[in-house]
Regions:
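Helix-to-loop junction immediately C-terminal to a conserved catalytic motif
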Residues: 48
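Conserved ABC transporter NBD signature motif
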Residues: 56-67
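Conserved ABC ATPase "signature" region
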Residues: 64, 99, 103-158
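ABC ATPase NBD coupling module
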Residues: 65-80, 104, 134-144, 214, ...
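Conserved ABC ATPase signature
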Residues: 163-167, 171
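A short, proline-enriched helix->beta-strand linker immediately N-terminal to the Walker B motif
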Residues: 182-186
Length: 271
């Protein structure tokens, strides 16, 4: 699904990612752990080109999305991302937050289809003709129905018309996750989704992520939650100083780490 080849990222003289090559297959749940400053979050942000790689390839569905000639927005629709600090719009209600991107993307697609229909009628047959197209009102109604169903899934349908400022951190993060799901992504990237939460709120977010794992959602997760890595990951990767030092299945990774650096890290966090 995603094939990263010789990925490098530099900020001036600071070489953050160093020749990273890794494949992520459909249905995998890859958990990335490591000390702060090891490049984990930068790697994640490069995967959907929120950060432009200095060099290397990120091949998604056969296309190098790191190539600046590629329309990255076409591919970002298929790669969801959940941030550490939720990134909800405080001036919009919960349901508006969930609906915003799906409505914008679908409206844009309909406008393009209408343009193609017009060109087709003028005789430019290379443009596809779409028989029936939804109105803006129909798009909004459909996306609202989908957003409501997602809120019901996490038991927060009564929060639909409330604003993010009235929610707990755990509620905000679960809404951020279903906002990503509303785009029907093929893969979701999680950047330390529980690190900004109070300890008592962590469990509800991890449970939702475990549910997604059971549904075989492709996930790449940067986290310090070792329990989640053990239970939900299909593969665990250890990063340090911009490199992927070690990777293995959770059972083998935690019971029999190979590198001294990984052994030292696990000895400090598994207490």
């Amino acid at each position: 699904m995603i094939d990263v080849v010789n990925l490098n990222k530099k900020y001036g003289d600071n070489h953050v990612l160093k020749d990273i090559s890794v494949k992520i297959e459909k249905g995998e749940r890859v958990v990335i752990i490591g000390p702060s400053g090891s490049g984990k979050s930068t790697f994640l942000r490069c995967l959907n080109c929120m950060e432009d790689p200095t060099s290397g390839q990120i091949i998604f569905d056969g296309v190098d999305i790191a190539d600046t000639s590629v329309n990255i927005n076409t591919y970002r629709e298929r790669i969801g991302m959940v941030f550490q600090h939720f990134n909800l719009f405080n001036n919009k209600t919960v349901i508006e937050n969930i609906m915003l991107s799906p409505v914008l993307v679908e409206t844009k697609k309909v406008k393009k289809a209408k343009k193609n229909n017009f060109l087709n009628k003028l005789g430019f047959k290379k443009h596809p003709y779409t028989e029936t197209l939804p109105s803006k009102k129909e798009i909004v109604a459909q996306k609202k129905e989908e957003a409501t169903a997602l809120l019901k899934r996490i038991g927060l349908e009564e929060k639909a018309d409330m604003y993010p400022s009235t929610l707990s951190g755990g509620q905000k993060q679960r809404i951020a996750i279903i906002r990503s799901l509303a785009m029907h992504p093929e893969v979701i990237l999680f950047d330390e989704p529980t690190s900004a939460l109070d300890p008592e709120m962590v469990g509800e977010v991890l449970e939702l992520m475990k549910d997604l794992a059971k549904e075989n959602m492709t996930m790449v997760v940067v986290t310090h939650e070792m329990g989640f890595a053990k239970e939900a990951a299909t593969r665990v990767i250890f990063m340090d100083e911009g490199r992927m030092i070690e990777e293995n299945t959770p059972a083998e990774f935690f019971s029999n780490p190979k590198s001294d650096r990984c052994k030292d890290f696990l000895a400090k966090v598994l207490v």
